[in-house]
């Protein structure tokens, strides 16, 4: 059930199981990571109604975290991230919700910190999500990668915002999605560099492939730049599946379902290729290998 030796399991805000290293302190629903040995922690969250969860990474902390969440119909999960100076955190999110779920993330990064996030958005749920990360200290770096699948009649809407409040900060997002059947999938990528934050870089990619004519998909990039000496770019697009590719795979002996599964896997794989952390890479690959299985 747990991917690391150390773990904690919350059910509606109450701890039901735990095996924590000495560097991790839990108070109610706040998990504090203290400086010491590098930390690996698997957090499992079960939400029936609404829950708030707070991650605090103190200065100089090095941590790898996997969060697996099971959110029930109309469940809401609110999370905050506080990243101390010189902290280096790799964080992977696995959604396994059902029904309609709401996710709200807010993060703040201090100077010279690094936060790399992976979002595996492959659940059987309709989702409304807002993920906002603010770079508050010089040299802060946030890199967010998301793979999203919307199928059947699911409706999934993601707003991903990285805001630069300090100079020489880096914010990168790569969001890839697949929509099939009669599903809706909308990804809004937002990069904001406020006045005076020179030397900063904001880059984003938002791409969705559509399998079926009854799907609705939209990939929307927004850049709000109030400073001259910066780097900023965006790439966005919604495209249809290549029917010839599908026919070719079927001619090689695959069923249509197997061929579509392979195409889905291949389209979402670029999100893995841009990740430079082995744990996040492996979790993405494991999640994507189960798509359509």
Model-derived features with residue positions:
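Long, low-complexity, mixed-charge
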Residues: 1-38
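Short arginine-rich
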Residues: 264-277
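Conserved beta-strand/loop scaffold segments within soluble protein domains that form the structured core
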Residues: 23-247, 251-252, 275, 281-293
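Glycine-centered structural positions embedded in regular secondary structure
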Residues: 5-8, 13, 146, 171, ...
């Amino acid at each position: 059930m747990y991917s690391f030796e150390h773990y904690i399991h919350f059910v509606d805000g109450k701890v039901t199981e735990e095996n924590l290293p000495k560097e991790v302190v839990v108070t109610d629903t706040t998990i504090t990571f203290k400086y010491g040995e590098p930390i690996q922690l698997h957090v499992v969250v079960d939400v029936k109604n609404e829950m708030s969860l707070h991650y605090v990474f103190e200065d100089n902390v090095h941590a790898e975290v996997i969060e697996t969440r099971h959110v029930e119909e109309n469940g809401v999960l609110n999370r905050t991230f506080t990243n101390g100076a010189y902290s280096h955190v790799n964080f992977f999110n696995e959604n396994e919700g059902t029904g309609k779920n709401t996710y709200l993330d807010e993060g703040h990064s201090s100077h010279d910190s690094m936060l790399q996030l992976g979002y595996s958005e492959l659940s059987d749920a309709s989702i409304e999500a807002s993920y906002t990360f603010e770079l508050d200290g010089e040299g802060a770096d946030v890199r967010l990668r998301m793979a999203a699948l919307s199928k059947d009649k699911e409706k999934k809407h993601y707003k991903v915002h990285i805001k630069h409040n300090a100079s020489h900060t880096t914010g990168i997002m790569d969001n890839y999605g697949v929509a099939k059947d009669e599903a809706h999938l909308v990804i809004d990528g937002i990069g904001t560099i406020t006045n005076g934050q020179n030397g900063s870089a904001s880059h984003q990619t938002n791409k969705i492939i559509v399998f079926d004519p009854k799907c609705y998909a939209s990939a929307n990039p927004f850049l709000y730049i109030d400073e001259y000496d910066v780097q900023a770019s965006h790439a966005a697009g919604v495209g249809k599946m290549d029917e010839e590719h599908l026919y070719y795979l079927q001619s090689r002996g695959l069923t249509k379902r197997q061929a579509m599964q392979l195409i889905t896997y291949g389209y979402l794989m670029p999100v893995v290729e841009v990740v430079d952390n082995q744990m996040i890479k492996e979790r993405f690959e494991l999640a994507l290998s189960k798509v359509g299985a």
